[in-house]
Amino acid sequence: WPTAMYFSQHGYDVTVVDNYFRRDACTELDVGMLYPVPTLVERAKIWQQHTGREIKVAIGDLTDAEFMRSLFDGRVEYAWSDAMGFAGIPEIVIHYAEQPSAPYSLINYKYANVTLQNNLLVTNNLMFAVKDFARDTHIIKLGTMGEYGTPNTDIEEGWLEIDHKGRSDRFLFPRQ
């Protein structure tokens, strides 16, 4: 959402797509949010009220190739849009549509399969939609970091103190 607001604020036409997988998975696993977070539609309305700028919202599953293709060929149905017409073929797609692989995928093989299916199919569907409809569209793909193995040390999580080549710092690992 912050990325969408950033580009909207800088004058770009923005469409955000979500299937609420993460929200639903948190509910399923009884690890709900720390505080209530508005839906994408609610956030888009609040954004427009405060800035006068529109962020279109489409709710759907990007593992469904036809839904993905609808975002490129004009068949998309927006859950929120001030002007309901097709936003047009995107110049840039920032692909965040991967679910965090761990710890969700480590629960059991079923959850691991859901993670793999989601993360591979979304990327595959995006590649074919761009190939078939929008070869000039640029893709920026951001995914989760997952590393597996048995190093001869603990795999730390949280704030780490580090000394390296005479410099010291503190940083959050594995995400910063």
Regions found by a protein language model. Name each.
Residues W1-Q176:
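N-terminal Rossmann-like NAD(P)+-binding domain of SDR-like oxidoreductases, especially those catalyzing
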